[in-house]
Amino acid sequence: MEEFTLDRNSNVGNLIALAVLNKFDELARHGKPIIRANGVREWTTLAGVVIQKKMENEFICVCLATGVKCTPAGIIKNEQLGSVLHDCHAEILALRCFNRLLLEHCILIKESKKDTWLLEVADNGKFTLNSNLLIHLYVSECPCGDASMELLASRLENNKPWNLTVDSEKLMRGRADFGLLGIVRTKPGRPDAPVSWSKSCTDKLAAKQYLSILNSQTSLICEPIYLSCVVLYKKVIVKSAIDRAFGPFGRCAPLAEFGEKDNPYYFHPFTVLETDENFLYSRPLNQAEKTATSTNVLIWIGDKMQCTQVIHNGIKAGTKAKDVEKSQTLICRKSMMNLLHQLSQSLTNEKNYYEWKKLNIKRCQQKQILRNILKNWIPNGGNEFQWI
């Protein structure tokens, strides 16, 4: 098992962060936070996937996203399922963007019969990450959920002592009962927001240490790809919380017992690095400053795509949800399924998305192992739709 460390000395964290921050600065203003007419400054979270070329020690941002919103499946109309993005938190969107890029590279390899700088064809016929590459994730805020419980409590005006209970049999809202640690939480965290079964970013990132960062589409055609490092701004890190949420001796420790020779999935805890570099549009640490969350989401996918989209309420900005096809983003489930269909019709014969996901038996089995260990992981709704 790879040792988990919180490296406070290495400059790698700054190099990864700067790769994302510099790329964000290069993008056009549209979709970025603004200062509103009443003088209130908007804030958001930025996340980006950075590829490190080991031999050259080069760090390349290949995709990024901003966002802090989540749309519960229950308020999305049936005809819009698969077209609307549910989870618009930056780190989740950035990983969706990376999966879109992987699909594009798979198609390129199929058409050209040649490996790309990102992917190679393995002996078993699946695509695999180039052995010279490492994958990192930068996030400007501490991921919502268990990793940020102590940080959230420290920002409260009434910072009274709270009971440090380690387990619970309940599925908790993101900001409920700070004293309950090491448990699965949902987003949105606010008690006044509509209920969602979407898991916190902490839980989703923890899950990816076992299931890999591949999604339902790419996991069918690619060998698992794992994050090497997650980089966070140093002032949002509470080491004990990070260790508990992600570390090999925290709540994910039992996952180390799984993984066999014929099982491509195994527990791969990422290293958490800190950075001195702060994102210009981050939520201010000074609670006295009046701010508002940005309602826009911005995604950018680089490399061979070089494409930017602004997203509002889970669909392309400037479109209406009733215009189902026109409103679809590059990374919604229907878009990803159509791209996979372009790559392999034999893998996409089942048109019901829920039934199609169940056909990936190996991944479903590994998901159940993960849910049994993390506990209280109730599957999301919103999968009952025809993707084509």
Curated annotation (Swiss-Prot):
Q: Which cofactor does it need?
A: 1D-myo-inositol hexakisphosphate; Zn(2+)
Q: Name one GO molecular function term.
A: RNA binding
Q: Which terms are listed as keywords in the entry?
A: Cytoplasm, Hydrolase, Metal-binding, Nucleus, tRNA processing, Zinc
Q: Which residues form the signal peptide?
A: none
Give the residues the record marks as binding Zn(2+): H89, C144, C201
Asked whether the UniProt record includes Cytoplasm among its keywords, one would answer yes
Name this protein carries in UniProt? tRNA-specific adenosine deaminase 1
Q: Which organism is it from?
A: Schizosaccharomyces pombe (strain 972 / ATCC 24843)
